[in-house]
C-alpha cells in the first residue's frame, strides 16, 4: 500500500469549524449472494497498519482540539463534579455472607470494591484493580463470592477489552491467590462450593478475529490453568452457551449458531465427572429462563408477550404450570426468587412497581415506586421480613428504602455510614413523562420526555433524542449528572422506545429484528418528527445519540432523513452491515440483524446500513462519531469507514469529527472518574453548541 499525503481543509459553519482530512480511496469490492459492493475504505480495517494508525492520530488531533474548545466554553465538567459530590450512593448489595459496593478513592484510578459483614459496619477495601494489575486503564467488571464466602473470584478488563481475566482473593488472609484465568470472554463465574469455578473460554487468536468457538472449563483452586478440565465444548457445533450452578448441579443453555434453537443440559457436580442430561431438546419456543429451584424450571413463556411465570419439573416435564399470569400492558421486567416469595417487577408506561407472591402464585402485596422511579432490590432480611431497595431515576441518584412485606410499612433507610442527602432538585423540579406517538404504520411507540417543569415549549428548545432499540433490551432510567445540567439549562431529553427493544414485550422485539429491522429506524425518525411537530424543538435544535445498536439506528436515521437533525453522535455503532460476519461477535447476531449469506436478508441489511446509504449529493448534519481502539465487540473500523466516507464528499460542508478512545473498549473511557467526567463534558458541550 502506497503512503499518502493528508490534505487539510478548513470548513466554517455557523457553530463548528473543522480541519478536514481527505482520505484516499483504494478500489476494493465485496461480493455476496450475487451482489457486488464497492468498498473503497476497507483498507482502514487493518488497524495494525501504521498508515491506519497515523490516520487515526490525525483524526483524533482534530476532534480533541474542537472538543477541548467546547468544554472550555461551556464548563459542563464543573457542574458534573458538583452534582456528583451532592448525589447519594445506593445501598450495597448482599452476596453470600457480605455486603459489597464500589467506591472511587482516587479520581485518576479505577473504582475499588469494598465489603462489610453487617450493613451497619464501616466498609473496608477488598479489591483494588490498580493494585492487582498496576495499570490505571483497567476495570473490575464483576465479582463472585464462593458458596461459603471463603474466596472471591473477580473479573478484570484490561484496556476496555471484552477479553478478560479472572483472579481470586482469600477472605481469611485477604491475600490474592496465584490462580489466573485468561482468554475469558462473555463469561460469568459459577462456583462449585468453595472448591473451584466454571468459566467460558474463547479460542480466538487475533484481537478482531471472527469469534471462533467457546469452551466451558472447570478450574480447581490452587491449580494452574493448563490443568483445567474441559467440561462442555462447542468446537464442532459453533454454538454459544450460558451456564450457572444451582443446588449441586451445573446447568448449560446452548444456543445454535443461527440463534433459533436451544438445548438445556444439567450435570451433577459433586464427583466432578460432568455427565450431562439434555432435559430440553431442540427447543424453538424461546423460553426465558428465570430460575431453577428444587428442580423446578421457572420461565416466562414466549406466547405471553408481556411476561408471565410458569414452571415444570426438569426430571419429568409432562406439562407447564402457569404460576403468575401475564398482566396485559404491564411489562414483567424481572423476578427475584426468595425462599418464600417471588417478587415480580413491572413497568407500566414508566410507572414501576413490585408485586409479591408466594410459591403457589398467591398475591401477597404490592409496592409502588415513588415519583415514577425504577428500583433495584439490594437484599432481603429474613429475620424482619424486610426488603432493602434503592430507587433511582434520570434525575434522582438514589432513595434507599426498607419495605416490610408483612405490614406494608416503608421508610427511608439510613445508618451511621449510609446517610441520605437532600435531592439536588425538588421532586417536582423536572417533569418526566412516558407518552406515545404514532409511527408511520400507526403503531403506538412509547417515548420518555424530560424537561424543567413549566418550561416554555415553543419549538426552539435544545433537545437530545436517544435510542437503543435492539436485542429485546428493556431501557431503564440512567442517572446522569451531565444530563441534569443539560436539563437545568433548558434542554429537553427524550428516549424513544422503538420496536426492536423489549419495552412492550417479546413481540415488540420481533417487530424490529431481522427483516423488520427497518422498523427500529423508521420509529426513531418518526420520534424526531413527533418532537418537532409537537413544538418541543426544531431541526436546528435537535441532537440524536445512540450507542452500539443505538449507534446503528442514529446512523441509519441520519442517512434516511438528514434534514431533521442538527447534530448526530454515534457511539461504538455497527455502521457497516456488510461486514457483520467478518469480525468478532457478529456471527452470533444473525437472528437480530439477518444472515448476510441469505440474499433476501443481506439486501435488507444493505438497505439501512449507514455506511452503504451515504449519498454523494447530501450535506449531512454535524457528526461526532465515537469509537474505541480496543472495542472487540463492535470493531472501531465501522466508525473509521463511516467517518472517512462522510468526510470525503464535496457536498459535505458540516464538519464530521471522529474521536477514537485510546486504551478503551465498548463502554468507552470509564476506567477512572476523571475520564468519565471528560467523556460526559465533551458529549454535552458538543450537543449544546
Predicted features and spans:
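Positively charged n-region of N-terminal signal peptides that target proteins for export
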Residues: 1-4
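Beta-propeller folds
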Residues: 7-372, 376-386, 394-398, 403, ...
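Cap/lid segment of the alpha/beta-hydrolase catalytic domain
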Residues: 130-143, 156-161, 175, 206, ...
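Generic beta-strand/beta-sheet core signal
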Residues: 169, 200, 219, 254-255, ...
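Active-site lining segments that contact anionic ligands and/or coordinate catalytic metals
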Residues: 248-249, 261, 287, 294-295, ...
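Short, solvent-exposed loop/turn and secondary-structure capping segments
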Residues: 56, 104, 111-112, 163-165, ...
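Secondary-structure transition/capping motifs at alpha-helix termini
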Residues: 119-121, 159-161, 171-174, 192, ...
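Active-site-proximal cap/loop segments of hydrolase catalytic domains
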Residues: 498-689
Amino acid at each position: 500500500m502506497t503512503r499518502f499525503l493528508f490534505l487539510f481543509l478548513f470548513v466554517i459553519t455557523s457553530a463548528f469549524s473543522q480541519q478536514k482530512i481527505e482520505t484516499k480511496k483504494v478500489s476494493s469490492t465485496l461480493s455476496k449472494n450475487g451482489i457486488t459492493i464497492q468498498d473503497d475504505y476497507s483498507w482502514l480495517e487493518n488497524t495494525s497498519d501504521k498508515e491506519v494508525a497515523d490516520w487515526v492520530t490525525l483524526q483524533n488531533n482534530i476532534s480533541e482540539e474542537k472538543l477541548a474548545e467546547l468544554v472550555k466554553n461551556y464548563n459542563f465538567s464543573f457542574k458534573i463534579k458538583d452534582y456528583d459530590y451532592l448525589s447519594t450512593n445506593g445501598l450495597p448489595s448482599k452476596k453470600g455472607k457480605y455486603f459489597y459496593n464500589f467506591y472511587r478513592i482516587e479520581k485518576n484510578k479505577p473504582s475499588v470494591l469494598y465489603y462489610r459483614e453487617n450493613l451497619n459496619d464501616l466498609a473496608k477495601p477488598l479489591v483494588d484493580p490498580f493494585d492487582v494489575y498496576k495499570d490505571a486503564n483497567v476495570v473490575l467488571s464483576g465479582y463472585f463470592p464462593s458458596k461459603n464466602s471463603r474466596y472471591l473470584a473477580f473479573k478484570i478488563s484490561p484496556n476496555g477489552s471484552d477479553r478478560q481475566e479472572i483472579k481470586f482473593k482469600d477472605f481469611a488472609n485477604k491475600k490474592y491467590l496465584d490462580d489466573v484465568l485468561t482468554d475469558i470472554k462473555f463469561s460469568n463465574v459459577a462456583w462449585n462450593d468453595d472448591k473451584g469455578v466454571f468459566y467460558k473460554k474463547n479460542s480466538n487468536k487475533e484481537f478482531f478475529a471472527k469469534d471462533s468457538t467457546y469452551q466451558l472449563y472447570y478450574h480447581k483452586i490452587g491449580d494452574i490453568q493448563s490443568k483445567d478440565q474441559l467440561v462442555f465444548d462447542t468446537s464442532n457445533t459453533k454454538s454459544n452457551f450460558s451456564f450457572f450452578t444451582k443446588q449441586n448441579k451445573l446447568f448449560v443453555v446452548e444456543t445454535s449458531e443461527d440463534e433459533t434453537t436451544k438445548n438445556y443440559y444439567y450435570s451433577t457436580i459433586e464427583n466432578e465427572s460432568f455427565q450431562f442430561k439434555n432435559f430440553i431438546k431442540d427447543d424453538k419456543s424461546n423460553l426465558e429462563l428465570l430460575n431453577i429451584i428444587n428442580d423446578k424450571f421457572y420461565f416466562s413463556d414466549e406466547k405471553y408477550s408481556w411476561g408471565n411465570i410458569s414452571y415444570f419439573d426438569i426430571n419429568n416435564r409432562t406439562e407447564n404450570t402457569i404460576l403468575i399470569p401475564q398482566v396485559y400492558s404491564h411489562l414483567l421486567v424481572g423476578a427475584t426468587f426468595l425462599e418464600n416469595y417471588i417478587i415480580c417487577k413491572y413497568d407500566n408506561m414508566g410507572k414501576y412497581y413490585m408485586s409479591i407472591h408466594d410459591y403457589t402464585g398467591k398475591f401477597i402485596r404490592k409496592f409502588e415506586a415513588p415519583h415514577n422511579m425504577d428500583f433495584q432490590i439490594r437484599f432481603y432480611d429474613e429475620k424482619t421480613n424486610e426488603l432493602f431497595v434503592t430507587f433511582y431515576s434520570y434525575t434522582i441518584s438514589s432513595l434507599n428504602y426498607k419495605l416490610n412485606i408483612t405490614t406494608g410499612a416503608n421508610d427511608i433507610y439510613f445508618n451511621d455510614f449510609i446517610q441520605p442527602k437532600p435531592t439536588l432538585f425538588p421532586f417536582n423540579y423536572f417533569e418526566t413523562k412516558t407518552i406515545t406517538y404514532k409511527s408511520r404504520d400507526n403503531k403506538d411507540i412509547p417515548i420518555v420526555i424530560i424537561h424543567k417543569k413549566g418550561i416554555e415549549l415553543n419549538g426552539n428548545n435544545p433537545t437530545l433524542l436517544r435510542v437503543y432499540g435492539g436485542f429485546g433490551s428493556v431501557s431503564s432510567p440512567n442517572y446522569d449528572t451531565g444530563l441534569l445540567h443539560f436539563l437545568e439549562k433548558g434542554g429537553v431529553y427524550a428516549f424513544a422506545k422503538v420496536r426492536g427493544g423489549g419495552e412492550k414485550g417479546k413481540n415488540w422485539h420481533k417487530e424490529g429484528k431481522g427483516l423488520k429491522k427497518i422498523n427500529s429506524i423508521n420509529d426513531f425518525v418518526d420520534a424526531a418528527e413527533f418532537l418537532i411537530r409537537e413544538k418541543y424543538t426544531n431541526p436546528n435544535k435537535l441532537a440524536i445519540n445512540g450507542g452500539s445498536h443505538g449507534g446503528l439506528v442514529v446512523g441509519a436515521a441520519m442517512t434516511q432523513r438528514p434534514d431533521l437533525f442538527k447534530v448526530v453522535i454515534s457511539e461504538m455503532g455497527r455502521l457497516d452491515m456488510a461486514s457483520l460476519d467478518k469480525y468478532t461477535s457478529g456471527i452470533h447476531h444473525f437472528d437480530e440483524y439477518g444472515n448476510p449469506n441469505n440474499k433476501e436478508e443481506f439486501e435488507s441489511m444493505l438497505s439501512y446500513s449507514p455506511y452503504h446509504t451515504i449519498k454523494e449529493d447530501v450535506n449531512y448534519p454535524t457528526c461526532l462519531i465515537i469509537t474505541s481502539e480496543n472495542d472487540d465487540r463492535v470493531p472501531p473500523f465501522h466508525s473509521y469507514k463511516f467517518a472517512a466516507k462522510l468526510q470525503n464528499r464535496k457536498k459535505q460542508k458540516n464538519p464530521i469529527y471522529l474521536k477514537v478512545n485510546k486504551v478503551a473498549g465498548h463502554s468507552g473511557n470509564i476506567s477512572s472518574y476523571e475520564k468519565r467526567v471528560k467523556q460526559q463534558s465533551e458529549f454535552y458541550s458538543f450537543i449544546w453548541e
